[in-house]
């Protein structure tokens, strides 16, 4: 594989000047020999008209941003280079400086005393011009190219075959032979060390712009640090336009060609503007948006009915310059016309398949992952809607009736718990779930004095109440009656607590207080609510617990005999006493014999409670 090099492109003044500067800095780097009386400068540089021949022998690595290969170069052209310098012609001076370097260390050279010979210290410089021409190169080299690191060139062999050296001392044969040998050795060192460095810097100049930009920024920052006048500031801004600047800003030729091609293509009066690859033009943006595949277009393509149904809607959105790529909400809603709209499941499947195809198209095929999507449950019933209707708070009139009435007496089955009987003055929504088979007790109104018509009470969370707060809308008579009933209940409750504490089973009292607190705040504080609650038993034999006898068992028969002595009806309800004593559940009823309100415990069928009455025993231990 071989290719030709456009050698004429190198004949440019900027490249020639830049090459001269690089060669000058390279030749004068390091310590100059004592035979030279001045620095080396490049007087003439010409690349010639004949290009070298390159032949690629092997390609080890080839990619967009890197390349590594072995090539062969053969050059027999008309390249010539002229160097100018001054040579020391006084041999005593040369010998004097050479002896100082060998005998005396450079660090102590100023302190060492030497004889001051006038003849040896005098310099006698002669100008010298060296011309290098007729260069013949034949060698094998290795090229390593990287877009970020530039180009590196290394030769395997000595590529220099011959070179012609001509100077101002050609008339002296001894000096001509000496210069020929010395320059050949220096050129071999040039191909071995200097030329790879020059090529590397040249490649960085045209491939990487970061270094030039960083150098310009550093130079600008140095100039800004020094106080400058307006004229100096204006001159510093011309740094980018100055052709003689040390660090000119150079753009990539490839990018410049693309920009020029785009610019020239618009300098036309043609109606059809030429297209460019991977470029979206503003004049064609509308067509590009319509033809671009999206979710809505895919749905219309898969469903013929949707095309006829929403074609007017799409035209309306396009006329209003609105985005029609969104999915209308009507597609997912069900209407009366099931033939066209009752396709929610199929639409969701189409949307899922389209999104999955797009996801797997751009994802990694080696390690595919499932897309994360949200699950939509269509036609799901709202279960909390029924709970909200049952847990709504009562009206103010109903709250007033709750405050002014008491519970109607009724028998409680073993399956029901004490929580079914509300003991609240003011109803509050209850957070826990209650079984639907538990019915709320009825309420009695004070105006009628009967328990026939009553509304169901809402099961609510107990709220502590320490002081009686009547409603402003109630009448004075109702308020007075409520206070009297409340005082009677407080007396009965206190009497019940005193009786329990004076009984022979204090352990049972402590157990009820500690375990039967129920729900709510202030369970153990006096006057918080109407009665003590029991903990709900989850044992499968909870209905048989009343037959068990524990250490804290209380003989209710003896207590009944004591309580019958304080009855006011003279044993009127003795027949029902035994039957009702089986259900040891506290309840409330109205005493209709004397027309006054009172609190009775259903287990003993006790009528109205007075100051001399004794409360019934507590519920059985379980």
Swiss-Prot record:
Residues 370-384 have a biased composition (Basic residues). It comes from the Eukaryota. Residues 362-399, 568-592 are annotated as: Disordered. It comes from Candida dubliniensis (strain CD36 / ATCC MYA-646 / CBS 7987 / NCPF 3949 / NRRL Y-17841). Residues 571-583 have a biased composition (Low complexity). One of its GO terms (biological process) is phospholipid transport. GO terms for molecular function: lipid binding. This is Mitochondrial distribution and morphology protein 34. Lacks alpha-helical transmembrane segments, suggesting that it resides in the membrane via beta-sheet conformations similar to those predicted for other outer membrane proteins and porin. Keywords: Lipid transport, Lipid-binding, Membrane, Mitochondrion, Mitochondrion outer membrane, Transmembrane, Transmembrane beta strand, Transport. The gene is MDM34. Signal peptide: none annotated. It is found in: Mitochondrion outer membrane. Belongs to the MDM34 family. Residues 1-204 form the SMP-LTD domain. It is a multi-pass membrane protein. One of its GO terms (cellular component) is ERMES complex. Residues 390-399 have a biased composition (Polar residues). Component of the ERMES/MDM complex, which serves as a molecular tether to connect the endoplasmic reticulum (ER) and mitochondria. Components of this complex are involved in the control of mitochondrial shape and protein biogenesis, and function in nonvesicular lipid trafficking between the ER and mitochondria. MDM34 is required for the interaction of the ER-resident membrane protein MMM1 and the outer mitochondrial membrane-resident beta-barrel protein MDM10. PANTHER family: MITOCHONDRIAL DISTRIBUTION AND MORPHOLOGY PROTEIN 34 (PTHR28185:SF1). Component of the ER-mitochondria encounter structure (ERMES) or MDM complex, composed of MMM1, MDM10, MDM12 and MDM34. CDD domains: SMP_Mdm34. Transmembrane segments: none annotated. Coiled coil: none annotated.
